[in-house]
Regions:
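FNR/FR-type flavoprotein reductase catalytic core
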Residues: 9-18, 25, 29-35, 124-273
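Residue-identity detector for glutamine
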Residues: 4, 38, 64, 83, ...
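Ferredoxin-reductase
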Residues: 27-137, 190
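N-terminal Lys/Arg-rich, disordered targeting/topogenic segments
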Residues: 1-9
Length: 273
């Protein structure tokens, strides 16, 4: 009996060790997959209103991501870019901006099927943003760690969306992907960011399942979403993206209206500079 117990205990220990090793291998595999970087070419950079830029990057054929995803964008090394890059923009062709920051997490404003990667961002003065938004066409950047905090498994429940400022970059791909599939409500507190406004207005006209407004104040957006709250309640998923203060205020508004916090998914844009 004693030998049987020892044998059983040894077998159990081996099983536990095998499970631990297997899980470790899987975990490292996931980390390696998410963290692997790809070098992308800058196609063009549109200078929009104010300090806003829309960056167009070449998309590798095999690259896929979830709508609303963000990624780590690293500045190029000097060996990967023409010498003229440093002549055009101080620090643009170096691996680090003047403050030592060489990468930031930025949201992808396009879907995998659009043929290019769009990055919508402010240039509010940081060395990193100055370098990024002034890279000449043909420059290289590295993209890695694709992830999303707005993904959901709900197959057909309504999406009620709020975007503040450049937070529209996270919501636009979700709207494009879900058109015709579920009820969609979107209020964009634009703060002058109107780059996708015409596109969204046309989509709302052509798709009865999309209700869209461009808002001029947080209270206006809250009033717009309140109608959706009264209509859908906790049967909808609430997707909020943009400046942290606005997202926090909208989250509190929804919770005060009785929306379960599990139904609210957020993406806070903390690094607008």
């Amino acid at each position: 009996m004693k030998k049987q117990n020892m044998k059983r205990g040894k077998t159990m220990l081996i099983t536990i060790l095998v499970v631990i090793v297997s899980l470790s291998i899987i975990a490292w595999g996931i980390i390696a997959y998410l963290g692997r970087g790809q070098t992308l070419s800058v196609l063009s950079i549109e200078k929009l209103e104010g300090d806003l830029s829309l960056i167009h990057l070449a998309k590798p054929d095999n690259m896929q991501w979830k709508a609303g995803a963000h990624a780590k964008i690293s500045l190029p090394n000097s060996i990967d870019n023409p010498q003229t890059a440093s002549e055009l923009v101080t620090g643009a062709s170096k691996s680090k901006a003047k403050d030592g920051e060489s990468s930031r997490w930025l949201t992808i404003a396009s879907n995998s099927n659009e043929g290019e990667i769009l990055i919508l961002t402010h240039n509010s003065g940081s060395p990193y943003k100055k370098s990024l938004t002034n890279l000449p066409a043909g420059s290289k950047v590295e993209l890695s760690w694709l992830d999303s905090s707005l993904s959901t498994t709900d197959s057909n429940k309504p999406f009620v969306c709020f975007a503040s400022d450049v937070g529209i970059a996270a919501i636009r791909p979700i709207i494009k992907e879900e058109l015709g599939k579920r009820e969609l409500v979107l209020s964009h507190l634009s703060k002058g960011v109107m780059v996708f406004n015409n596109e969204l207005e046309v989509s709302a006209k052509n798709h009865a399942n999309l209700s869209y407004e461009s808002s001029s104040s947080l209270s206006q957006s809250q009033a717009y979403l309140n109608e959706a709250v009264e209509r859908y309640g906790n049967d909808a998923t609430y997707l909020l993206a943009g400046q942290a203060d606005d997202v926090n205020a909208m989250t509190k508004f929804l919770e005060d209206k009785g929306i379960d916090k599990k139904k609210i998914k957020t993406s806070r844009f903390r690094g607008l500079k």
